[in-house]
A protein has these predicted regions:
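Selected transmembrane alpha-helices and immediately adjacent juxtamembrane segments
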Residues: 1-39, 128-183
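Structural signature of hydrophobic alpha-helical transmembrane segments
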Residues: 5, 35-53, 109-120, 149-159, ...
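Residues within membrane-spanning alpha-helices of integral membrane proteins
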Residues: 6, 49, 119-122, 126, ...
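Residue-level signature of the transmembrane alpha-helical core
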Residues: 10, 14, 18, 49, ...
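Hydrophobic alpha-helical transmembrane segments in multi-pass integral membrane proteins
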Residues: 44, 84-94, 155-160, 194-197, ...
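Selective hydrophobic functional segments
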Residues: 46-105, 192-238
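Transmembrane helix exit motif
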Residues: 56-62, 87-98, 112-140, 231, ...
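Cytoplasmic-side transmembrane-helix entry/capping segments in multi-pass membrane proteins
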Residues: 69-79, 139-148, 181-184, 241-246
Length: 261
């Protein structure tokens, strides 16, 4: 690989990790397409999981004191169980029928009914973060487990658990520090599960050309992005975090509807 390729990886990770510190998602969404430019998709997925997991451990060391344990238990545990069900349902559904396909930058992209539904849901939930009247709505504590189930299920079936987790967590009344700490703790547990699933592939990728340097750069710049995010924590508010979450949901939802993700 050339130096410019490593630079693209570094800048992508730096940007993604900085955003993820506040939003609770985004690093994997940005990094996977970048890695897939240079490596086979199975290698790219495993490499993304390694960087994501390493960064979540680093981030947890910074924010563990702010984890809101009651929410972690009442929201996180149902979310994890529902995420597994969603992932199993996705596997059961098999290959989706293509509604429309087109070519963009020499790559064939397909729009399926599932992608449209997931994208539409993300766009809908984005309104709850961006519109003033809806952004002030708070979830009653008795509905927190239900929020965990819904976020986990939609996350499991879409492969983007962080996005749905964040939009529900912002409605639980947590402070910005508690939101970041609790979201990270849930993500870390999910990452541990994911790493075990990818273990076989991870052992295979070590000798793949360019992967060691790419991983080292990815992990180092993820740490740097997370550090930058931590420095900006005092300058942001929970409203600011909601806007970041909403903006990312709009982008990712649009990409789903367009068949790019």
């Amino acid at each position: 690989m050339e130096i410019i390729n490593y630079l693209i990886i570094a800048l992508s990770v730096l940007f993604g990790a900085s955003l993820t510190f506040f939003s609770g998602f985004g690093l994997g969404t940005i990094l996977l397409p970048v890695f897939s430019l240079y490596f086979p998709i199975d290698i790219a997925i495993a490499a993304t999981a390694i960087v994501h997991f390493s960064n979540n451990i680093f981030k947890f060391g910074m924010v563990y004191k702010h984890v809101h344990w009651p929410t972690l238990i009442r929201f996180g545990l149902p979310a994890m169980g529902a995420a597994l069900l969603g992932a199993l349902l996705l596997n059961f559904m098999g290959k989706q029928a293509v509604i429309y396909s087109y070519v963009l930058f020499h790559k064939e992209l397909s729009i399926t009914s599932l992608k449209l539904v997931i994208g539409a849901l993300m766009l809908f939930f984005a309104l709850f973060e961006l519109l003033p009247k809806l952004s002030n709505w708070k979830m009653e504590q008795k509905y927190v487990p239900l929020g965990g189930v819904l976020s986990g299920f939609f996350g499991g079936i879409s492969g983007h658990q962080g996005a749905f987790r964040s939009v529900f967590l912002t409605k639980t009344g947590l402070s910005k520090e508690e939101f970041i700490g609790t979201s990270n703790a849930i993500a870390l547990v999910i990452d541990i599960t994911r790493i075990t699933v990818y273990a076989t592939t991870i052992f295979k990728i070590i000798d793949f050309n360019g992967i060691k340097t790419s991983l080292l750069i990815g992990i180092a710049f993820a740490f740097l992005g997370t550090y930058f995010g931590k420095q900006l924590l005092t300058k942001t508010t929970i409203k600011g975090i909601q806007r970041v979450v909403g903006a990312l949901l709009l982008v990712i939802g649009g990409l789903f509807c367009a068949g790019i993700l």
